[in-house]
Amino acid sequence: MIAKTTNLNLFYGKKQALFDINMQIEQNKITALIGASGCGKSTFLRCFNRMNDKIAKIDGLVEIKGKDVKNQDVVALRKNVGMVFQQPNVFVKSIYENISYAPKLHGMIKNKDEEEALVVDCLQKVGLFEEVKDKLKQNALALSGGQQQRLCIARALAIKPKLLLLDEPTSALDPISSGVIEELLKELSHNLSMIMVTHNMQQGKRVADYTAFFHLGELIEFGESKEFFENPKQEKTKAYLSGAFG
């Protein structure tokens, strides 16, 4: 187990957005969060790196590697908990600098050789190196949308996170680019724990080891993806998977 939440409740002012969420996130597995828009998926995801701190009141416990995230320095926390957003958000810097910036900031690189090796390694992990090896000094904004999103994943990997959060990482991409990202995530999960929000149920079925269904801020059902999709236990889950609402 890499992380867990215990009796997690979240409030935006007087409105409660999450209700008593209890969940365990397994090590080196992909956990998908599904549910209709506004059900609390992204809100839940952002509890792990404290991105809700300034806008919400949070009760309950969120732990990563047995440590309460509330008691951790937020910069140190976000080094260990990477995040990839819905829209690619590359830095307005070179492809090379997009990878090297954060490791240098955190003092993880001792010399130029280490820096270059890290950049190459991260780009290779996301299958991007061969596509960009001759243009590492070019602005990352020149890349296609799919390439930019893979660069964002490589950038997140550069600081060696324990947990990677992905908020609909393929929703802004074409089907081919989405497929590339899905295969990449499955490969990365051999050595990395991930939580992924997705509106695409079939994507969750293809990619995730575990799936959680949220409805109106409540965790309705959670389990191994094969069993979850083939034999859902809760009536609301069955209705959602059948397309009765969403």
From Swiss-Prot:
Transmembrane segments: none annotated. Its EC number is 7.3.2.1. SMART domains: AAA (SM00382). InterPro entries: AAA+_ATPase (IPR003593), ABC_transporter-like_ATP-bd (IPR003439), ABC_transporter-like_CS (IPR017871), P-loop_NTPase (IPR027417), PstB-like (IPR005670). CDD domains: ABC_PstB_phosphate_transporter (cd03260). It is a peripheral membrane protein. Its main location: membrane. It comes from the Bacteria. It is found in: Cell inner membrane. Keywords: ATP-binding, Cell inner membrane, Cell membrane, Membrane, Nucleotide-binding, Phosphate transport, Translocase, Transport. The keyword Transmembrane does not apply. It is an enzyme of class 7 (translocase). Residues 3-241 form the ABC transporter domain. ATP binds at residues 35-42. It catalyses: phosphate(out) + ATP + H2O = ADP + 2 phosphate(in) + H(+). One of its GO terms (molecular function) is ATP hydrolysis activity. Disulfide bonds: none annotated. SUPFAM superfamilies: P-loop containing nucleoside triphosphate hydrolases. One of its GO terms (cellular component) is plasma membrane. One of its GO terms (biological process) is phosphate ion transmembrane transport. Belongs to the ABC transporter superfamily. Phosphate importer (TC 3.A.1.7) family. The complex is composed of two ATP-binding proteins (PstB), two transmembrane proteins (PstC and PstA) and a solute-binding protein (PstS). Part of the ABC transporter complex PstSACB involved in phosphate import. Responsible for energy coupling to the transport system. This is Phosphate import ATP-binding protein PstB.
